[in-house]
Amino acid sequence: MIDECITVAKMFNGDMVLAKNRDRNYRPRLKIVRDVTSYGIEICYIVDVDTDWTEGMNNLGIGVVNSALFVKRDEKDYSKKKKTKAPSKDGVRVREALGKGTFQDCVRSLAVYHGGIKGHTLVGNGKKLVAIENTSRTKPVIKVKDLNKEPIVRTNHGIEHPEQGYQQGNDKLSSELRMVNALNVTHQTGDWRNLLPNFYRHRQDKGPKYDLVRAQNKLWTSSQVVMNLKQKEIILYLVPGQVKFVGVENNLPKGYKPKLSFRVLKYSKNPEDKYGGNKS
């Protein structure tokens, strides 16, 4: 399985925004789940119904996004030979954390619950942003980041654990280039609703496989998600032909008025269309 992602956190005019660009080598089936925990916390999250990958937010304005570090070893979502997808252990960790009643408890849960979430995790509450970096070979490094100084971007190579993740060759180059390019696009974007569409249009001179949104035979961007933690809004973007949205599972109590909102949007063009048929 190949799992390459970009996660982003930035302040947009006082609104903390988390975003994720999700690349896969299979066609995911995604759904949105609405629920209220036994403690009265409303949660809304996107889940891959085959692997249990989960990202989302709660009514306290706490959101979580994640990208992998052990791209091919720990995250074996899909085997082309067996045509099967192994469940992600991080899905239950994210849902457990989103059900917590405080930001501190949410961060603690992500760091320790069932051994702690793996990879790069960005978790924010609209005011504070915490970056967690963890693998099955290391201990988690937890740092508070000041988004008022600069945005945060993470891809698939280690920062606090530089020996982890992509380490050599085109994989390392891809991860580093995507991080630099994503940071540049993020800096240049003034409206949070334009962030991921700007990722979608991104091009650079090293060829399509290094674009932020890609359409390759072995790897392609299947979906994107952006969360405005202040406005408590989630937007899920679908890439044509690369993902299937299977609907909404609404577990909210009858008569409950949701505090969280979401939209599902589908791009009208494929990523390769930006090259006008002249891909290299």
Q: Model-found features: residue ranges?
A:
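C-terminal, well-structured catalytic/ligand-binding subdomain of enzymes
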Residues: 1-4, 9-101, 105, 117-119, ...
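Short regulatory alpha-helical segment in sensory/regulatory domains of signaling proteins that mediates
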Residues: 111-114
